[in-house]
């Protein structure tokens, strides 16, 4: 999880034009405590920078865990059914 976290920060801090980060979760089958904590940290730090954290293609049991923990409501961004939905919506709101 720390590798992903560091990569996100590196990319966001290197480009001040980034307004949204989307994590494609199609390969995620479960979320453990350390991954949950990492997502909370990333969400908070990105929000402090004015960058939204969004998730796409979240599987049912992972979505259940995010809802149960409250993280689904705490996200600075949204959870999208598909990556295409995320791209379309975020592009539309970025062009306003």
Label each region the model flagged.
Residues 1-96:
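Structured cytosolic domains appended to multi-pass membrane proteins
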């Amino acid at each position: 999880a720390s590798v992903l976290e560091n990569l996100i920060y590196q990319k966001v801090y290197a480009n001040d034009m980034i307004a949204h980060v989307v994590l494609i979760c199609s390969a995620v089958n479960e979320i453990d405590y350390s991954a949950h904590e990492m997502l909370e940290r990333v969400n908070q730090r990105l929000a402090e920078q004015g960058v939204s954290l969004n998730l796409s293609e979240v599987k049912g049991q992972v979505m259940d865990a995010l809802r149960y923990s409250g993280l689904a409501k705490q996200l600075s961004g949204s959870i999208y059914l598909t990556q295409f939905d995320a791209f379309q919506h975020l592009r539309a709101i970025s062009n306003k």
